[in-house]
């Protein structure tokens, strides 16, 4: 007895068993490969009989095929099936295609004319394909970086650090490893292929790199094909300009030597001009010596008059002082929390990479958020917090923050800043397997978008984060190039509530003009948003509710909206006629709440046990 003619379903079951058995943490990538192969197998249109037919499926290689073949052999032995014989349909199909294709027939005739030695070997030498790196890959960036630095046979070599600093802008991947996120390989590994193909030379200690003649030609063609323009101050451009200048000098010299009489006339004109200029200089000197002692020379008004400073308009509204900054009176700066690092070994990664892209940054401790855009006045140096703030998370850090309720607390503090554009940036790199928390992350991200009105930005790694920050900085600079700022200088901000209330009050009054934006000065934001052990009664009430297992910040806020104080909650419990009514009080009150803010029966009972049974 033989297996069905289309054993695709059977092979899919075997492949699923392989996935289920690969559960350890170090097999995470294997599981991804097998899942991809399983998806391709289920969607493969043609029948599959013999294990070798699996090689036609995208994502299934020799190793996976061997595993499935062993499982099929065991299955056949246990169930009394005969192991399938390899069919010749593939060979027949291939020969039919060769016969019907005239180009293939021609190839066969050519091979018959080759010497008998090649026929006896049965193989034909394959022509070596010319190596050309993929666009925006590691090798692509290295070639263009060396070309821009002028590191070729006629120039000097450069170190790895110098090369990476320039090559990074031409590559989408990082040239640095990051073992903390399992990034054990980097784009720098492409240097091996470049050396193997004689495009790059490595020499000396420490290693220095330069282009070969073939590498220079390839790099130049890549530059031309992709319309890349190097910086004017680069070695490549300076060398190019120097060559053009020398060519123009050579051409001028050639023109003069062709016509000797013209050259003599040119020389006579130069002599006469120099003589006239000397005479004018002597006359001017003589005239200046005749100036009397009491006569003072006139001084240019442009030099003596100091440039007036631009005045800052100041005012007071409802007892709160403010300043008005014109659009051209301030610069935009990206401020990064100094605790935001790529890894322990590379703490200045973000500031360094952004500076290479021409983005001005500052770094210090932020009391809220990880990155914020500030406006800095050109004369006073005073700073104010703009309406754009970023909270950055890696996937593993996101999972931990959700589990320990830090995620909800951070969102609450970000909302208290009053920023209109709050970005939650998630880097899809992780130090361990987080696939078991996928549903939890999806739920948290969706609630953040829908209920908190945050922007979610997903990036592949730290390098794509830098690129996104660069793009955002340019957009924000363009946006604020036409905006005036009303900077609030509140003297008595004692808590976050006053900070947010005053900001909303100013926005209502001043932002009726779309060309004006209101914001607090940076010092006020830092002092108002600092974490403190001193809590208001409202915050203490929320903390008490959140001490009950299962009560998130969203649920606590929903309870507080129905029962504003702890006293009103206790009175509501005491008004219940029976104990059963008290146990389901919160459940019934919040039955119309959104999904993540509803209180179930058991949780309502727990709340009564904690607070209502007093």
Swiss-Prot record:
Say yes or no: keyword DNA damage present. Answer: yes
Q: Where is the ERCC4 domain?
A: 333-430
A GO CC term assigned to this protein in UniProt: Holliday junction resolvase complex
For this UniProt record, give its keywords in alphabetical order, as a comma-separated list: DNA damage, DNA recombination, DNA repair, Endonuclease, Hydrolase, Magnesium, Meiosis, Metal-binding, Nuclease, Nucleus
| Name of the molecule in the record | Crossover junction endonuclease MUS81
Query: Subunit structure of this entry?
Result: Interacts with EME1.
**Gene3D superfamilies reported in the protein's UniProt record:** 3.40.50.10130, Crossover junction endonuclease EME1, DNA-binding domain, DNA polymerase beta, N-terminal domain-like, Winged helix-like DNA-binding domain superfamily/Winged helix DNA-binding domain
The cofactors named for this UniProt entry are: Mg(2+)
User: Which InterPro entries is this protein grouped with?
Assistant: DNA_pol_lamdba_lyase_dom_sf, EME1/EME2_C, ERCC4_domain, Mus81, Restrct_endonuc-II-like, WH-like_DNA-bd_sf, WH_MUS81, XPF_nuclease_Mus81
Enzyme Commission number(s)? 3.1.22.-
Which BP terms does GO give this entry?
A: DNA catabolic process; double-strand break repair via break-induced replication; mitotic intra-S DNA damage checkpoint signaling; resolution of meiotic recombination intermediates
> Where found?
Nucleus
Stretches of Basic residues bias are at 123-132
Q: Where is this region: Disordered?
A: 80-132
Q: What does this protein do?
A: Interacts with EME1 to form a DNA structure-specific endonuclease with substrate preference for branched DNA structures with a 5'-end at the branch nick. Typical substrates include 3'-flap structures, D-loops, replication forks and nicked Holliday junctions. May be required in mitosis for the processing of stalled or collapsed replication fork intermediates. May be required in meiosis for the repair of meiosis-specific double strand breaks subsequent to single-end invasion (SEI).
The gene that this protein is the product of is MUS81
Which ranges are annotated Low complexity under compositional bias? 87-101
Single GO term (MF) = 3'-flap endonuclease activity
Pfam families linked to this entry: EME1-MUS81_C, ERCC4, MUS81-like_WH
Report the enzyme's class at the first EC level. Answer: hydrolase
